[in-house]
């Protein structure tokens, strides 16, 4: 229905989850995320095609098979980019990216360019690439005010990242 209301402009993005603890509430481990993601993405495709959903009387109405051409996949890995490319989906890149062990200051483009290259190499002939990179914009009256507003959340996030085993260099908001 939303695609009808937007006159065919709906784009839909999916990702397997960003942190290992994201899966625990669903009774899954992080290691199971790839298979679970593939299964659920297949279910979405089936629903959009109008296939039955667990019972002959259960179908998505109205069916929306056109949405399969407007899927975006979020990934941190070249393997995920290859799967997205092979399926002809768009590639979503994050504003941040886990750094390889021992390289906490590796620039974002050094991590994401190989992901983009893998995606482009995997696209079927004739399929136009679709790549987006999310970025954060924080608007404030001054740099000092922006830091003051952001500091509590950034400190909390840094604490959570450290607890999850990530290396966070520095101890100030500007680090």
Kindly label every feature range from the protein language model:
Residues 1-175:
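Active-site-adjacent structural elements that line small-molecule/cofactor binding pockets in enzymes
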């Amino acid at each position: 229905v939303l695609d009808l209301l937007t006159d065919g402009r709906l784009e839909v993005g999916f990702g397997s989850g960003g942190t290992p603890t994201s899966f625990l509430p669903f009774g899954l481990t992080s290691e199971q995320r790839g298979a679970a993601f593939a299964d659920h993405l297949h279910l979405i495709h089936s629903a959009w095609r109008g296939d039955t959903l667990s019972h002959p009387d259960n179908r998505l109405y109205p069916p929306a098979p056109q949405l399969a051409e407007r899927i975006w996949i979020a990934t941190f890995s070249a393997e995920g980019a290859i799967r997205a490319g092979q399926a002809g989906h768009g590639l979503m890149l994050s504003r941040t990216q886990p750094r390889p062990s021992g390289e906490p200051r590796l620039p974002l483009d050094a991590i994401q360019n190989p992901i983009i290259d893998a995606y482009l190499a995997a696209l079927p002939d004739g399929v136009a690439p679709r790549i987006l990179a999310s970025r954060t914009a924080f608007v404030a009256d001054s740099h000092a005010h922006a830091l003051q507003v952001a500091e509590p959340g950034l400190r909390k996030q840094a604490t959570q990242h450290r607890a999850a085993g990530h290396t966070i260099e520095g101890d100030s908001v500007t680090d």
